[in-house]
């Protein structure tokens, strides 16, 4: 099941490039969280919010870090909101699948014991990528 895209007859069909873009966007979530932590550690940008940040080109490093943090948080929020919309109460499993690359077999065996069957899991994943691409 790994790497399968929905067929052209599916209501969640995306062309190959768009599907790959949505998959790679979702896989970047953990890296964006790590980058936010490093940006917060190296500057005082944690105290900035979107209303206080100036978008001038001559801003200092703290302002640039704050702008980057705000941008990354908005990307993470898009992914998280899409997961909560489509997951049907299985947020943790879908997050592991789309953000960490876990397969159906990995989620049904071992310590995770996901309660979804293969078809339902695939449909939720395809719906997630379809919805995420239209949010990006």
What are the residue ranges of the model-derived segments?
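N-terminal interaction/assembly modules
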Residues: 1-85
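DNA major-groove recognition helices of helix-turn-helix
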Residues: 121-135
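A short pre-motif secondary-structure segment
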Residues: 93-94
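Helix-turn-helix DNA-binding module
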Residues: 100-117
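Short, locally clustered residues in the helix-turn-helix/winged-helix DNA-binding domain
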Residues: 84, 98-99, 133
């Amino acid at each position: 099941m790994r790497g399968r895209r929905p067929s052209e007859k599916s209501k969640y069909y995306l062309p190959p490039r768009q599907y790959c873009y949505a998959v790679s966007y979702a896989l970047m979530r953990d890296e964006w969280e790590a980058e936010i932590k490093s940006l917060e550690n190296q500057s005082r940008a944690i105290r900035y919010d979107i209303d206080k940040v100036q978008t001038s080109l001559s801003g200092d490093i703290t302002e640039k870090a704050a702008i980057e943090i705000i941008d990354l948080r908005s990307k993470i929020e898009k992914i998280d909101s899409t997961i909560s919309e489509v997951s049907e109460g299985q947020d943790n499993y879908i997050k592991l699948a789309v953000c960490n690359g876990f397969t159906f077999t990995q989620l049904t065996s071992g310590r995770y014991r996901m309660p979804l069957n293969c078809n339902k899991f695939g449909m939720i994943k395809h719906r997630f990528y379809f919805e995420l691409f239209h949010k990006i």
